[in-house]
């Protein structure tokens, strides 16, 4: 079983990418569980046809410790098992703790015992604070992919996340599998991210082009592969799935200093 964490700055399209990617893996016959580690609890919405899933933390708050796996796990498109860890009430508590509680709960209820090929953790945002680093810190997820675009803040966040990965690489055995570009149609975007990935010591594992089909599918509460399986964008996600499935490059990233990051951005015309 491969345990994969998807990181990236807030709003970059991690949840969309994760759900479309896992749909592609499901088509390849893989057995998958997606664990949403974001208080917004939208990591499995497209797989479940828009169903607002009850989160692990809400269930614990309402029902106490006596929880059945069926209550917190729903089966979505391609038989993908879907769980949302949820978050604390706003202004109270730490969302990162929620992730820890959820993963522990899933382990206790035997969610990992079902012959899974993949578990994906879709993890909130830019901050690699203690709780959000949980899937990598505790050695749950062994491989990480960072979703980025050619925008400065997305790359800044990717560099920061790499610092977190390199910090936990020795203790948790975690490795970076590559950068996934979720294109924003920035000038020289692919070349920029290839140079950025190379500097980090990793690879641009796939470049997902921008497409209106993604938004159309989202409005219909589906992944592109389910909504319009013959569309070119569906094939892009299938190719991303194959790239992840066949990946054999796992590294401890070498995060760069701010001036080096800015030099790469300048070289490709972003800071002109």
Curated annotation (Swiss-Prot):
Catalysed reactions, as listed in the record: N2 + 8 reduced [2Fe-2S]-[ferredoxin] + 16 ATP + 16 H2O = H2 + 8 oxidized [2Fe-2S]-[ferredoxin] + 2 NH4(+) + 16 ADP + 16 phosphate + 6 H(+)
GO biological process: nitrogen fixation
Role, per record: The key enzymatic reactions in nitrogen fixation are catalyzed by the nitrogenase complex, which has 2 components: the iron protein and the molybdenum-iron protein.
Disulfide pattern: none
Assembly and oligomerization: Homodimer.
Record: residues binding [4Fe-4S] cluster: 94, 129
Processing after translation: The reversible ADP-ribosylation of Arg-97 inactivates the nitrogenase reductase and regulates nitrogenase activity.
Known EC number: 1.18.6.1
Keywords tagged on the record: 4Fe-4S, ADP-ribosylation, ATP-binding, Iron, Iron-sulfur, Metal-binding, Nitrogen fixation, Nucleotide-binding, Oxidoreductase
Organism phylogeny: Bacteria, Bacillati, Bacillota, Clostridia, Eubacteriales
Molecular function terms, GO-annotated: 4 iron, 4 sulfur cluster binding; ATP binding; metal ion binding; nitrogenase activity
Top EC category: oxidoreductase
Cofactor binding, note field: Binds 1 [4Fe-4S] cluster per dimer.
Keyword Oxidoreductase included in the entry's annotation: yes
Residues that coordinate or bind ATP: 8-15
Ranges that cross the membrane: none
Obligatory cofactor(s): [4Fe-4S] cluster
Protein name: Nitrogenase iron protein
